[in-house]
Every structure is written in C-alpha cells, then in structure tokens.
Amino acid sequence: MFFAKTIENWTDWGAVYQDIPAFLPLARAIFAREGLLPIRETAHLTPGTNAVFRADDFVVKIFAPRESGLDAESDFRTEQAAIRRAESLGIATPKLRGAGFLEDKYRFYYLITGYIPGKEAGEWLKTADAVQKEQFCGWLWDTLRSWNTPCPDGVFRRDMAGYSLQNPRWQGISPAAEAHRRELLPSLTAMPEVCVHGDLTAENLLVPADGEPVVIDFADTVLAPACYELPPICFSLFDYDPGLARMFWKSPEPLADALLAGLLLHDFGANFMEEICGRFLGISPKALLRLEPVENFLRKRYG
C-alpha cells in the first residue's frame, strides 16, 4: 500500500490533498509504471481541487478518489481528452506524459504533464506594459477561436443551461432573483454549443519568459455556448479591468450581453455574482429582487 491516509468524505480529502509526503510513495509508484526516472525533488504548486505538485520536470495530478464524494473518473477523462484536443489544435499546453489509474487503498486516477516554468497570467498582467497586454489579449482571442469550436458528443458534459437549473450554488441568491434568472435561461438554450475550457482564471494561464502563453487545467471543459468562457476571463484573469476586456473582445456583440449570458450559465456563476454584489454593488445577493443591478453594472463597466 502506497497511500496510508484515510479518505471517507470531502473533509478528509481537504485535510490531505496538499500533503506531498502523503502522496509521494504513490507518485513514485506511478512514475515507475510510466517508465519515468525516480523522483528526486518535489515542490508545491497553486492548490486546486486535486493533489497537484511538481516532481522534478513534471507536474503530478492525483485526482480525489470517489470516497471523497467527487466524481474523479469523469474529471480525469474530461481533462485527458481536453489536453489531447488542445495538442491536436496546436494550443500550447504542457505535454501529457502519463495517464491512468493506480489501484491502491483507493483507486487513484492520475495525469503527469511536463512542467513549464512561467508566471501566472493574472500576476503577469499587473506589471505588463500596454504592448504586452495587447499581444496577450490578441493571443487569447485567437486561441479561443480555435478552441471554441464544435466537437463530438459524448466526450464532454453538455446542456449547461439544464444543469444550471439544478446547480446548488444558485441557492445563495434571493428567490426573486433566482426566479428572474430562470426566466432568462430558456433563451440561452438555442445558442450553439462549442468546446469551452470554462476555467481560464488568473491561475490557469502561464506566461513563460520566452514563447507564447500556456493553457493549463482542463478539468472543467464542457460543451456550452462560447460566452461560457467570459466570466472567468473578465472577472478573474482580467480582475474586472474593462481596458483588458476591450483589448480582448473583438465580436460585434456587446460584451455586457455575452457576459451576462455566460454568468447565468456558468458552473460558478453564482460565485461571481456574489463577488460582484459585495465588491461593486455593496449588497448581499440575498437582497437582489431581480438581476437588473448586476446587468446594469456589466453594461456600465463593459458596454
């Protein structure tokens, strides 16, 4: 047995997922299985949902076992398929070096990718000059034109409008605002579904010292309208900077309209709405009677 900790629920996983020594015997067994050299050094990376750390020139991602309450196999297959799709489209992403599962105390799915040194894009943008920002935003727009295209059914989750009706995160807004949101959702179902990354946040794009930016963490890839990409980009990656959003947005459609649609659909749309209410509107999402205050904020800020 390589993993000695006990995982019976999400709290157990949360207590251990950043504990590299707890996962190191497991990682060494995985490296041996994949024919990679023994691990010499490890280092922490930005924490997420799963156990992720650097091991020499690789990044090891060990998915939470099903005993944690998370659907690890689905997340694993989604990310594996998305990485391969990105590679086939020529999108810069760490090369996949190993993928599978190891049956131990629990069944652990894993991915091994190459490690690419770089600065997280959210931090990099804070000190980038105007030319660098323009180039970055242009690169991101062009990359998404390639990525946000149709792909075969059955690979990624779809019908985000239908899922959004059941998404428990929306319980955090008032019943009146939620009723208004549900009035608007049917109009979004007619929008064409394409492949979306869904999590292009400040942490999930890396800017190397040389070369083009790199996209990481494809675990939230789904089929959805292209506007689904916008909330993480505008609210996390760009940190609500309308100047960056205007550099990026090259569609004739008003950005505010597309942003609102993406916000209503997104798996974490309720979290973004809560942030907008607290940071910019000075109200609780429980105090919203309808969505107009949020819509007006988006129109005023983004046009």
Which ranges hold each PLM region?
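Juxta-kinase regulatory segment immediately upstream of eukaryotic protein kinase catalytic domains
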Residues: 1-38
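Short, flexible/disordered intra-domain loops and linkers
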Residues: 11-16, 66-75, 243, 276-286
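An alpha-helical support segment within catalytic cores of ATP-dependent transferases
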Residues: 19-34, 101, 132-138, 146-198, ...
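ATP-binding pocket architecture of kinase catalytic cores
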Residues: 41-155
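Active-site acidic catalytic loop and adjacent metal/ATP-binding pocket
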Residues: 46-56, 182-228
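Short beta-strand segments
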Residues: 61-62, 97-98, 160, 195-198, ...
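Glycine-rich, phosphate-binding/catalytic loops in enzymes
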Residues: 128-130, 214, 231-233
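Active-site activation/catalytic loop segments of kinase-like enzymes and analogous catalytic loops
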Residues: 227-256, 262-293
